[in-house]
Structures are given as structure tokens and as C-alpha cells.
Amino acid sequence: MSTVLTSVIGGARVPSGAGRLYRSTDPSRTTDVVAEVSLADADDLVRACEAARNAQDAWRDVPPPVRGQVVAAIGRLVEANKAALARVVTREVGKPYAEALGEVQEIADTCAFFLGEGRRLYGHTVPSEMPDKQLFTFRDPVGVVTAITAGNFPVAVPSWYIVPALLCGNAVVWKPAEYAAACAEAFYQVFAHAGLPDGVLNVVYADGPETFRGLERALVRGLVDKVGFTGSTEVGARIGELCGRHLQSPCLELGGKNPMVVTEDADLTLAVEGALFSGFGTAGQRCTSLGTAIVHESVRDEFVRLLDEATRAATVGDPAGDVLYGPLIDERFADGFEKVLGWIGPRHAVHGSSGTGRISPSNPRDGFDGDAEAGLYYHPVIVDGVRPDDELFLHETFGPIVGVAPYRTLDEAIALANAPGYGLSASIYTTDPAEVFAFRRRISAGMVSVNNSTSGAEAHLPFGGNGRSGNGGRQSGIWVLDQFTRWQSMNWDFSGRLQKAQMDVVEITPDLGFRL
């Protein structure tokens, strides 16, 4: 790029040169620099929170239906720039272009939902137990929202925070992933041209340690009222602890070890299709990616055979083409996946490709379509025979690898599904409604799919997890409004005298001894 990207605080660019320089590269051609970014420090994050605080009062006072019109304008701009934004996503994070188009559409869908919520930020009129007295409730914005997002969904997930936060009357400080800075810049430009006042949306390009230090200082100074974080369970726990010290409850959307239960009467062709998409789509780098397929022992061998066949037939390679998945997003994720591959032991049976590890001329994959030497491409891996005490069973892998474990009874399958302690997404393939509802009732996941994959979200359905996958907060739909507003109650006594609740209530005496 011809210019260095810098943070935007209060509508103004932070001068470049002061911060460390970070180069974001194309993971399919790692020598191709997509963006050069001047990284901000902790003080910059604090300044961004100050700018948001200064802008928030005026933004709060813009009537909600008008804020909804700004959201509508964002949605129209996203649709007008859909192809261009998707191309940036494909180039910078290696997401196949068809998937990138779907991700951009998710922003537009989110805007389409929330533009109407500007006219529906309803409170309630509540009857009082006193005469000549009325009770009301109101939704008020929380204030300043700091959103910290990962780069595997570099534009869709930020919209889940930023669109409803703005709609509710909050000002936002957004810290995107530095390895997805070009995506963040394009996203910000679309939002800025929708008419947002200066300071209402601020963007801070920073690394993790500086972000944490800045957030800590901003919380101490009372500049942040809500933190949203999408990322790893380990970092989410640290952010949760930090916010807890300031009596705040963050919105945490963390990792997943998402199970798929395949019963003895399941449609195996459909189950394999779901496993292929959720296990290897986006190179397994989704929080909702399939972790372990828990398959009834009577169909396990056939399931593994079919999944192996489908995975070997799938095209992996250049994300600009028609591929199942492209490269891993960044070197840091490739290094992490190399560690995961070390968890495969001699008692495991490995399927899915002509090799394991990084695809290269010396470790080729049949049907690969791309320049293997240029990018961060990895073989898909199916590991049969994983056990509950395996590292591969217990931990999120964030790469193109799927474990398979057998079960005998549904009780055993549910116990295995819950064992890793995550609780984001779970799936069951069955034709038995009783099994569906028994599974739904006892699975720990915040999202359950029936005869569908573990991956997939819609803008009007709550998204979020429990346990190691989050603290119970939900994104999307009307449910996210509770993250970005606080309820305020008001009582208005127009009787002209003091009426004391529970003490001055009119008593009506029933004859409870009456019998027919």
C-alpha cells in the first residue's frame, strides 16, 4: 500500500511514525504486503476512549429512529461496496471469495435488522399498586463501548458489536486484529461515510499487550462502560477478570470445541456434508468449527469412510478460486496448528489427505489448486479414535482438523460432547425427535443445530456460548440490546401525597373459608 494505516481518534488520523510498524500480508502469497500499519500504544487507546466519551452525549441525544437511519445508510453502503470489501477479506485473511461475499452480506443483514430497532427501543408502561401513580421503564445506552475483535471474521463479527452499539446510542472504540487491518480500514471507511459524527466510532490499531494496558487504564479512569471481546478463551478470561474488578460484565464470545453427534439412524450423506463444511470451511478457523464428530459405533466406520472420501475429493488452494478452504490466516495460526498436529499419536488413525502438515512440493496434496510454496496451506486431517483424555479432544484446534470418537448410548454421547467444557455450538444428526429434545435439554451449548452443521449464524438469532466459550452474553437479534443498553425505571406519583409502597396499598379482604 502507498500509505501507512493509522488509528482514527475523534475523527482525526493519528500521525504515523510514532508507533511500531506492522506489515499485514496475504496468507496465500506471504511476500505480498496488503497493508502497513502504525501500531498504537496504550495511551492512544485511552485517548480514543476519551474521544468517545466526549462524543457520546450528543450521539445519545440523536433520536433512536434517526440513529436507525444511519444504520440503514451503512447497510446500503455495504451492499454497494460488497464485491470490493469481499476482495479485501479474501486477500488479507485468505477466506475463499464466495465465503467472503457471505461474510459481507452478514453486515448488510445486521444493518437491515437493526435499522428497525431504532423505532422499537421500547420501554414499558407498568401498572402501579397505588392509585394516581404510574410506572415506566426505559432503555438507556451504556455509554462508551470498547470492542476487541479477531480477524477470522474481520468484518462480520465487528458489525455484531458496532451496529447495535451505535443504534442504542453508544460511542465505540474498536480494536481490530492487526493482521486484518486492511479489512478494518475498509470497514471503517464504509461506516464513516454513513454520516457518523466524529468520535462516535474510533479505530485503534494495536497489538494485544498494548490493548490490555490501555483498557486497564481506561477502566480505572471510568472511560469505558462496556467491553466486547471476540477471541481466545485464555485472553477472554483475563478481560473478564479485569472488567470484574470494575464491576462490569463484558460480552465475551470465545472459542469452541464444537461436537457433532451422529446417531445410528442419521442420514450419513447429510452428516458428512455438514462435517466437511463445519470442519474444514474457513480452514477450520471459525469459533463454530466442528471439533469432534461423536459417531454411534454401528455407523462409525462408514461415516469415517465417507468423510475421508469427501475430504480427499475437495479442492484446497487459492482462495480466489472455487475451493473448500484456502490458507491459514497468519503465521501465528500456522505455528499454533503445527503444535496441534503434534497431538496426533500412534494409536490414532489419520485420514483425509495424501499427507499431513503444510502442503508443499515435497508434501503434496492431490487436487491442490494454488501455489503451495507461496502460502500457508495445510492438509485437511481426520483423526479417528480420539479419546476423552486426548489433547486433541479437549482443546480448540483452530485449523483444518476433525476428530472422530465412538459412542454407544445417547447419554454417553452427550457426556462426551460436554466434556471439554466449551459450550458454543453443537449439532446432532438423527431422525428421532425424542433424541433431538433430549440432546437439546442436556447439551451445554448456547446454539444447537439439528441435521445441520455446527457453523452458521443469522442476524436475528442469538449468538453466543457458555462455559469456556463465553460468559452467557448473546450477540445478534433483539437479545444483544441487553448488552448495549441498561434498564432504567421511573415512578411518577401525581396523587399529591406521599404513598408508601407495600404499606399504603388498599386491602381487599376475601372470605377464604368459603366452601360450596
Kindly give the residue locations of the regions a language model identified.
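Glycine-rich loop-to-alpha-helix module at the N-terminal edge of alpha/beta enzyme cores
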Residues: 30-122, 132
